[in-house]
Amino acid sequence: MALPDFTMRQLLEAGVHFGHQTQRWNPKMARYIYGQRNNVHIIDLSQTVPLLYQALKLVSDTVVRGGRVLFVGTKRQASDIIADAASRSAQYHVNARWLGGMLTNWKTISNSIHRLRKLDKILAAEARGFTKKERLNLERDREKLNRALGGIKDMGSIPDLMFVIDTNKENIAIQEAKRLGIPVVAIIDTNCDPDGIDYPIPGNDDASRAISLYCDLFARAALDGIARQQGAMGVDLGAQAYAPIEPVLEDVAVDTSAADLISEDTTPVSN
């Protein structure tokens, strides 16, 4: 495999360049804003491209060293996409409510994960010896724990890198990562505060197409890291029963700048 490729055109088609209404902006994002159109800020994709590439390389390099990447996105339009991307790249995710202390109080979280594993074993054995009512209660307990912790059940320890969709909503998760020295890669929209984000990526964090694009790229970057790691260990990927499949990308040559691809009625922002 190779580090996933992407084009400026793909970012535009996914709506990555659309920020929020101008009155909802965070002035700290001014340096990442190209201009405004119809009272909506337009993100400067000429800055997004290199920052996104840098983050993808970081993910691959983290995984090749055996590191763990935690995908975090609990908003409605990101939840399923986050879970799918993490699962298919053998990484970890939190896509329901972030529980305070999920990282900083890992010992307590580990106890809850142990409880979840125990419930899995009991129910896998059809909860023999339990009444119908007791089994129902066990199933409810497992469902509740799995919704909160299922995505990190096999993580084993705190992650080596965190990828976040919507820094405003996931502020507690970011604070916990910072306290533990875990680097944070995050999509930052025009209403976000980029301060404290180790690897900011300017882009829309609300549109499903944009979120799908980010998550697909990061999942493939993690898979690239796994492939590189296995290659270094002498594993023959072609001999595996389920060899990694590289998606076919549309070959779109883009020689124009973001300014050329955004309509001419865009008004430059004043810093």
Swiss-Prot record:
Family the UniProt entry places it in: Belongs to the universal ribosomal protein uS2 family.
Gene: rpsB
ATP-binding as UniProt keyword: no
SUPFAM superfamilies: Ribosomal protein S2 (SSF52313)
Organism field: Bartonella bacilliformis (strain ATCC 35685 / KC583 / Herrer 020/F12,63)
Protein name per UniProt: Small ribosomal subunit protein uS2
GO biological process, one term: translation
Molecular function terms, GO-annotated: structural constituent of ribosome
Pfam family, one: Ribosomal_S2
